[in-house]
Design a protein with these regions (language model features):
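Short acidic low-complexity segments
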Residues: 1-8
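Short, well-ordered coil/turn residues at beta-beta hairpins
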Residues: 15-17
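Cysteine-nucleophile active-site neighborhood
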Residues: 19-92
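Amide-donor transfer/coupling interface in amidating biosynthetic enzymes
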Residues: 43-44, 77-170
Length: 170
């Protein structure tokens, strides 16, 4: 929705994202009252929140895509470019294992579909994947969870995650 009042009334919120960090933050900022509504409903109001791909990255303090840009600042960290090498393709695209590294009600081991060129580096990492070394697959705390992978493309694993999110009472 583009309506901050709908966000304020929402039972739970999903913030998807495809594209560049700055463009997505600019898109939120261009909707009068949207960032304030998200802050009020999610951080102050405790509504369950799921950020997907760039939606997860926006939870960070800073994104470094096309310069350094402020994110929502809900989870301490920066979003940095993945470094390509002859053995490592960027973007990271395809199926990879999701490996829990800290307890979280919604994250279980499994295989998910990833498509990204930037990765979160910071606090509150709850799952990683391997792409030439550990890469953040999910971040979370309290009532917020962000996943770098795409649940909507991750077949059974993604459907199960979305079902758990719909039942989640943090």
């Amino acid at each position: 929705t583009a309506d901050p009042d709908a966000v304020l009334a929402a039972d739970r919120i999903v913030l998807p994202g495809v594209g560049a960090f700055r463009a997505c933050m600019d898109g939120l900022a261009a909707l009068p009252g949207m960032i304030d509504a998200l802050q009020a409903r999610v951080i102050k109001g405790g509504a369950p929140f799921l950020g997907v791909c760039v939606g997860m990255q926006l939870m960070a303090d800073i994104g470094e895509e096309f310069g350094a840009h402020r994110g929502l600042g809900w989870v301490r960290g920066r979003v940095r470019a993945l470094t390509p090498s002859p053995e490592l393709r960027v973007p990271h695209m395809g199926w990879n294992d999701v490996v829990p590294v800290a307890p979280h009600a919604l994250i279980q081991p499994g295989e998910a579909y990833f498509l990204h060129s930037f990765a979160f580096d910071g606090d509150e990492v709850v799952a990683t994947t391997d792409h030439g070394g550990p890469v953040t697959a999910a971040i979370g705390r309290d009532n917020v969870l962000g996943v770098q992978f795409h649940p909507e493309k991750s077949q059974r694993y993604g459907i199960a995650l979305l079902e758990r999110f719909l039942e989640w009472r943090p």
